[in-house]
A protein has these predicted regions:
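Segments of small-molecule ligand-sensing domains
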Residues: 450-465, 475-589
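Detector for the c-type heme attachment site
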Residues: 36-39, 65-72, 126-130, 158-159
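Electrostatic cytochrome c docking/interface patches
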Residues: 22-57, 110
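Extracytoplasmic ligand/sensor domains, especially the bilobed periplasmic-binding protein
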Residues: 251-356, 402-430
């Protein structure tokens, strides 16, 4: 990383005159390999040296480590790394653009600079001498570059982030949101209602007559844009979704897929995003990407995370809590991934898991589930990888005594209250990737207020919290990006700012709650009396009241904490094991600490 920083610092000083040009594709590709892989045109590792005699080679010398794929820079330790994309590195004198490499500092204009000649560029890269004749940073390595290497890296940099990504114009940013055919009508309807309400408010605030100053930099540079969002509702089998997405995209290219919702697989959507290099922005899905998710940003790994958390929990159990046998029942679809992840995680630990598959047909599946439950013996642990509908099959089946039973909140949508057979509530434990109830209510006070003001019903708290967060985070990130609207940069800014943004939002909301608690408590309670909602523990007003009493929240979503880092794609990485309280069968109580497998 230090070596990459040295190359980054060198390139940060190179500002070359001229606009983008069409270099031969093979030359640009050779430059890409130098930039991203540290491989010279000859195919050999890029070589460099620095003061003290240290030799740098190959990936150590590649600048992508700190300038990132967008060329928009970053921060390494306390050292900001300047942008080197076409608009920055090759800007002419007086062509000033603004960027924000370090979220801890203010946004800054790029430096006014004289254009670099080819000779000046070569001297800077090879000898560490800038166009002014002054030596560049002492940590700058001197690169071994022949004329072909110099031509290639220049060609690559001249096209890097040279113009807006597809879906962006001076006035508008295009988005799409994807809904897969398996989503219930109730969830589909509230998702679309919330999206439309938020979109109307967003575009109203950025209209010329109603524009407000979201930030001094964005106001001064007039970089606020109207959002244009299409809803792409897929049909048919999952193997046809890729072609449907490609057809939508050909007709209407978008900057990113904004949120989205699916109750089964998301793999075709993630594959489309990777192929087209379109960011997939925090969709509400039980099964996100099963691959590298190069262009996907997700809340968590979904059911796969639940499975790994449960495997870790059971593996660490000691004494009487340690299960004699491990069994799992899977109901098909998303449950197959959970069962596979659970089995693989325990296999690594030397444990075997007996897997029982139940049919999707209600009558047949229920009989198979009954038989599977009867096969369990005292001291066993059984994971029930079942959907919310399949969990209802437990009604009328008595749980075998002495068996530990576990369900997945992600798979069975238990983040929102679901009906569970009364005889099962005392024995069923749940892998719960969300904040515990008290903290969760404080975290979601703003969401509940937003819904109440717009008369939008609370249908699925997890889904609605995720959509609310996704829309707000996109707004904040675009404000931070200003006019540098490149897809890679959208992902990079989110990797860098998410954790800090969450901490800042929490602090702001806690201050607001204190103020409201002092000035508005009586008014809120009076409104509740008039509206008859004070006694309703699920009402938005009750959530506000609990927030006042709780004081500080720890996040802004249903998740305890969200953060990302370079190349990280899943913002929440753990879960609790919870069970229904004995004293209050509708209250969840933690059985474990936050488990990160």
């Amino acid at each position: 990383m230090a070596a990459a920083l040295r190359f980054c610092l060198l390139l940060s000083a190179l500002f070359v005159a001229g606009g983008a040009f069409a270099a031969p594709a093979d030359l640009v590709e050779q430059g890409r390999r130098i930039y991203t892989e540290g491989i010279s045109v000859s195919g050999q590792p890029l070589q460099a040296s620095r003061d003290g005699g240290a030799i740098l080679s190959g990936p150590q010398a590649a600048c992508i480590g700190c300038h990132r794929a967008s060329g928009m820079g970053s921060v390494e330790g306390s050292q900001p790394v300047s942008p080197i994309g076409q608009r920055y590195l090759f800007a002419t004198v007086g062509d000033l653009v603004m960027a924000n490499m370090d979220g801890r500092r203010g946004k800054t204009l790029n430096q006014t600079h004289a254009p670099y000649t080819d000779e000046g560029l070569a001297m800077a890269l090879r000898q560490g001498v800038g166009i002014s004749g002054r030596s560049l940073s002492t940590v700058m390595p001197h690169f071994v570059l022949d004329e072909q290497d110099l031509a290639a890296i220049k060609a690559y940099l001249q096209q890097l982030s040279a113009g807006y990504s597809p879906g962006v114009s001076k006035e508008v940013i295009r988005f799409a949101t994807v809904i897969t055919p398996d989503v219930s009508e109730a969830r589909r309807a509230v998702f679309k209602t919330m999206l439309q309400s938020a979109l109307t408010a967003k575009n109203s605030s950025t209209s010329p007559r109603k524009r407000y100053m979201s930030s001094a930099a964005s106001f001064a540079t007039q970089t606020e844009r109207r959002w244009d969002v299409q809803v792409w509702e897929l049909t048919g089998e999952a193997q046809t979704w890729g072609a449907q997405l490609e057809a939508h995209y050909r007709e209407w290219p978008v900057f990113a897929l904004l949120s989205g919702i699916s109750d089964t697989t998301w793999a075709p959507v993630d594959a489309f995003c990777a192929a087209q290099k379109v960011p997939c922005w925090f969709p509400s899905v039980a099964v996100p990407s099963t691959g590298d998710a190069a262009y996907g940003l997700y809340f968590s790994r979904g059911v796969a995370l639940d499975a790994r958390v449960l495997a870790s929990y059971l593996q660490d159990a000691n004494g009487e809590a340690a299960p004699k046998r491990l069994l799992q029942v899977q109901g098909g679809g998303s449950a197959e991934l959970a069962a596979r992840s659970f089995g693989q995680s325990l296999m690594v630990k030397g444990r075997t898991v007996q897997t029982i598959t139940v049919d999707s047909d209600v009558a047949k599946g229920r009989n198979e589930l009954r038989a599977a439950l009867q096969s369990a013996r005292p001291g066993d642990a059984m994971a029930l990888w079942l959907s919310a509908e399949q969990l209802r099959w437990l009604d009328g089946i008595q749980p075998p005594a002495g068996v530990q039973f576990y369900a997945s909140a992600s798979l069975a949508q238990l983040g929102t209250p679901q009906w569970i057979a009364p005889s099962w509530k005392p024995v069923l434990q749940v892998v719960y990737p969300y904040a515990l109830p008290q903290a969760r209510q404080a975290n979601l006070a703003y969401l509940h207020s937003w819904l109440k003001l717009r008369n939008i019903p609370l249908v699925d708290e997890v889904l609605q919290s995720e959509l609310f967060f996704s829309l707000n985070l996109m707004t904040d990130t675009l404000q931070d990006m200003l006019d540098n609207l490149y897809r890679d940069y959208l992902i990079e800014r989110t990797e860098d700012m998410l954790g800090r943004r969450e901490a800042s939002k929490v602090e702001q909301e806690n201050r607001d709650r204190i103020t409201l608690g002092r000035l508005g408590r009586e008014a809120v309670l009076a409104e509740g009396v008039r509206g008859g909602a004070v006694g309703d523990a699920t009402s938005p007003l009750a959530a506000q009241q609990r927030a006042f009493g709780l004081g500080e929240s720890g996040g802004t979503t249903v998740y305890p904490h969200l953060s990302l880092g370079p190349t990280q794609r899943f913002a929440s990485r753990g879960a609790y094991i919870v069970r229904f309280s004995q004293g209050n069968i509708d209250t969840l109580t933690a059985q474990s600490d936050w488990i990160v497998p």
